[in-house]
Amino acid sequence: MHTHRPKPGFIWKFTLLIAGGLLLSSSVSNPENPSVAVGEPIVWVQNKAPKVPSQDDLAGEPVPFESFGVREQLDREMVVNTYHHSSTMLYFKRASRWFPVIEPILAEKGLPDDFKYLAIIESGLSQVVSPAGAAGFWQFMKGTAPQYGLRVTKEIDERYHVVKATYAACDYLLEAKEEFGSWALAAASYNMGKAGVRRDLEEQGVDTYWELHLNSETARYVYRLLAIKAIFEDPESFGFSIQADALYQPYATRTVWVKAPIEDLSAFALDEGANLKALKTLNPWLRSSRLTVAAGDSIAIEMPV
């Protein structure tokens, strides 16, 4: 049996007409609802294009807006991160908890404060694992981590230790800055590796990040860092209004020094007046249900107060 079906275009037009009629009827003639004024216009919410600054810097190094493509590339990242609302809002919430941990380490190691935003573009300040296997706030690969003092075993993975991984990231960035002479190139190397930056600089015959033709991810990397920095420095200009009580607060913890093996971390947590969920949340670097402690060694574990 054949039936006549209206064309898809007609269905869409008809649906829009009905939807428009419902909207108009609710705002124009609803005498039983005094909260809706007769003749009240429909207000369409429009997104506002974020303003690209006329000048900017990364860690004190000026951004060369006169260079080819620089302004437009920064504009793209500002648009993406301004209107990536849920993720950017979570960045603000998590930063309230973790920047007080990260900032003093950067200062101690002599890194510019701008590099705290690197942890946001790497992981969103979450203990995530990339498809390539990079892990933690600072996204160290398993093979690279030990080179920067991070222990990785079946029971312990210090890529997830925020304090230790931050120190390791600082060491990497300082090495890269020493080699390339630029914080922008140091940041780029954090994404693609020192060898990759070294190769591209040599092959292309340029000497700055802003002139390099890079893979799509690294080409956006420093611009994304700059965009996040701009949004964090003036959130209301980008449409973010964050109440203090909506931010995540730093964890209140006490340190327990463990000098003997723990056969059952669940039982250990209960003995300390907590539970495994709290233990693993505060110590995500504990990757097993037990913990081996060598003779004469001691390991610091954070527990809720």
Q: At which residue positions do the language-model features occur?
A:
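An acidic, Gly/Ser/Thr/Pro-rich helix-cap/linker signature
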Residues: 2-110
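Solvent-exposed, acidic/flexible segments
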Residues: 84, 88-99, 108-111, 130-138, ...
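Short, functionally critical alpha-helical segments immediately adjacent to catalytic or ligand/cofactor-binding
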Residues: 111-126, 186-192, 279-282
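Substrate-binding/active-site groove segments that recognize
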Residues: 133-153, 166-169, 173, 197-200
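Catalytic and binding regions of secreted/periplasmic enzymes and modules that target cell-wall glycans
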Residues: 173-200
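Short alpha-helical segments in extracytoplasmic peptidoglycan/chitin-binding modules
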Residues: 190, 265-271, 278-280
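Primarily a LysM-type cell-wall glycan-binding module
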Residues: 243-273
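Extracellular LysM carbohydrate-binding repeats and other cell-envelope/extracellular binding modules
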Residues: 282-305
